[in-house]
UniProtKB/Swiss-Prot annotation:
Keywords: Ribonucleoprotein, Ribosomal protein, RNA-binding, rRNA-binding. It comes from Alkaliphilus metalliredigens (strain QYMF). Belongs to the universal ribosomal protein uS5 family. The keyword Transmembrane does not apply. This is Small ribosomal subunit protein uS5.
Length: 169
């Protein structure tokens, strides 16, 4: 069962991937102030994944801040073998991501930002379809929402007060 306890990123061997870097502008009386915003995904490829955004005047600083933010909101993803336990739809803004289990050996069938999250989560066989917007920030957040909704059969059986055999039929 997933509780809202914090996962210590320092004890995990984390890998990071930069999904998106944008130059953002603030217009002031004296002209324009440019900054960079980086969207970063971190994961240990063993069930832990997190997403963070960092903003700074320089790109490396923005990426570093994004990594720190991602490590602060890690998520434990329940898996069944090499895939997800069940089909789920994640929503964020105008973006929806349909995540479906796949047979072993299928690989990750997903588009850019969604693929980055699923790879770093350690899911090896999965199919995903991006619906709605193709904005990378919304796609990553919708994928995280979908992964947050996943539940193992044991957890659902415990919630319903039944055994796993009764639940699965």
């Amino acid at each position: 069962m997933q509780f809202n306890k914090r996962i210590d990123a320092n004890q995990l061997d984390m890998k990071e991937q930069v999904v998106d870097i944008r130059r953002v502008t603030k217009v002031v009386k004296g002209g324009r102030n440019f900054r960079f915003a980086a969207l970063v995904v971190v994961g240990d490829e063993n069930g832990h994944v997190g997403v963070g955004t960092g903003k700074a005047m320089e790109i490396p600083d923005a990426i570093r801040k994004g990594i720190q933010a991602a490590k602060k909101n890690l998520l434990l993803v329940p898996t069944v073998g090499t895939t997800v336990p069940h089909e789920v739809i994640g929503h964020f803004g105008a973006g929806n991501v349909l995540i479906m289990p796949a047979k072993e050996g299928t690989g990750i069938i997903a588009g850019g930002p969604v693929r980055a999250v699923l790879e770093l989560a350690g899911i090896k066989d999965v199919r995903a379809k991006s619906l709605g917007t193709n904005n990378s920030r919304n796609m990553v957040s919708a994928t995280m929402d979908g992964l947050r909704q996943l539940k193992r059969a044991e957890d659902v059986a415990k919630l319903r007060g039944k055994s796993v055999e009764e639940l699965l039929g």
